Amino acid sequence: LRLEGLRSIIANYPEMKIADVRTSDISRLQASEQTRSLLAAYPDLKAVVGFSALDGLGALDAVRQLKTQRLLFAFDDLDETKEAVRSGGIQLTLVQQPLEMGSTAIALLHDYFQGKSVPDVSYTSIRLLDGSGSAQPAGEDAP
């Protein structure tokens, strides 16, 4: 869903395109190797988006090793990711809300077993954590 979401947003910006999609198998080492490979194949690449909790950190490792700069975007709020956002190595991370996810799941299950209609898909909010240090609401919670 994360890649699908990115594609749906990028479609609104004709000046932007996704150069390539790689998999890291949720491995920081693989994310670093894939980022180095991407930057070799696409030297003008401006940004890298990591979709697993470790991908952003792996991409950061790669740009540091290559002594280059790129815009890096991540998911989730591992302590090291939050520090990388604070220090400017990662521009932004999208943070899930696990308590909301769990309570929504329980409420939907309750409704389902009560015979009520439940949606096929239910989205929960996310927070955007950037270098300002404040988590901004996004998704359905955005103003």
Where in the sequence are the language-model features?
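Conserved active-site and cofactor/substrate-binding residues in soluble primary-metabolism enzymes
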Residues: 1, 48, 54, 100-104, ...
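A generic structural signal for alpha->beta connector loops
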Residues: 15-18, 44, 69, 89-90, ...
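Hydrophobic alpha-helical
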Residues: 6, 20, 24-83
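Structural detector of well-ordered beta-strand residues that form the stable sheet scaffold
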Residues: 49, 71-73, 91-94, 129
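Hydrophobic alpha-helical segments within soluble ligand-binding/sensing domains
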Residues: 1-4, 30-32, 78-81, 96-114
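Ligand-binding cleft/hinge of the Venus flytrap
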Residues: 3-16
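Hinge/cleft segment of the Venus flytrap/periplasmic-binding protein
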Residues: 9, 97-143
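Short beta-strand elements at the ligand-binding edges of bilobed clamshell
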Residues: 21, 87-99
